[in-house]
Regions:
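Regulatory modules associated with amino-acid/nitrogen control
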Residues: 1-197
């Protein structure tokens, strides 16, 4: 590579870097103080809304760890987007304020800060199972209250529902037995008590 090609490549890389802002997750300070937060976003159920919400995260280099969307009020055409993201308190507050400014957004609630939220997730976990590992997989499934939803002579598919941490633990314990793959729904969350989110 000659010096002209190298200079051109450097110029292209600097333009690309300028087009994408630095991630708030990339600083060592940001990682040290980063906490996981579950945001509940009530939006109009119309085309393009999810793309606008996800675009806000993408444009600012915010990571989405989990995302679920469903209509919650058919008569008023409202949907709830549940987003799990990590960041410093300042980053989460910035995300919340930017979401609130989007036109189709009715409300944004940080369910993590209320400490009154219930979070659940469903996962289907496929595991190889022969001989002793078959017995071990079934014992672990029973301990975690996972249901067998499919079984062959060589594998199982378990269905497990619970807090994300419980599912993480179940998956980690299945790895040495013969974990094949996992499909997760993402987090669904709701606040406790009689009041709506």
């Amino acid at each position: 590579m000659n010096h002209v090609d190298r200079d051109l490549r450097t110029l292209q890389m600097s333009k690309t870097a300028a087009a994408y802002p630095p991630s708030p997750y990339s600083s060592p300070l940001g990682k040290a103080n980063a906490e996981s937060h579950t945001l509940s976003v009530l939006v109009d159920n119309e085309p393009g809304v999810l793309a606008r919400v996800v675009g806000l995260f993408s444009a600012r280099s915010f990571n989405i760890e989990s995302l679920t969307v469903a209509e919650v009020a058919h008569e008023t055409h409202l949907s709830r987007i549940t987003i799990v993201t990590s960041g410093t308190p300042e980053v989460i507050e910035q995300v919340r304020h930017q979401l609130e400014r989007l036109v189709p957004v009715h409300s944004v609630t940080d369910l993590t800060s209320s400490a009154r939220a219930i979070e659940r997730e469903l996962a289907m976990v496929k595991v190889r199972g022969r001989g002793d590992s078959r017995v071990e997989a079934l014992q672990l499934a029973e301990a975690f209250r996972a249901k067998v939803i499919d079984a062959t002579t060589e594998s199982f598919i378990f269905e497990i529902t619970g807090a994300p941490r419980k599912i993480d633990d179940f998956v980690d314990l299945m790895r040495p037995i013969g974990l094949v793959e996992v499909s997760r729904t993402g987090v669904a969350a709701i606040s406790r008590g009689p009041e709506p989110i």
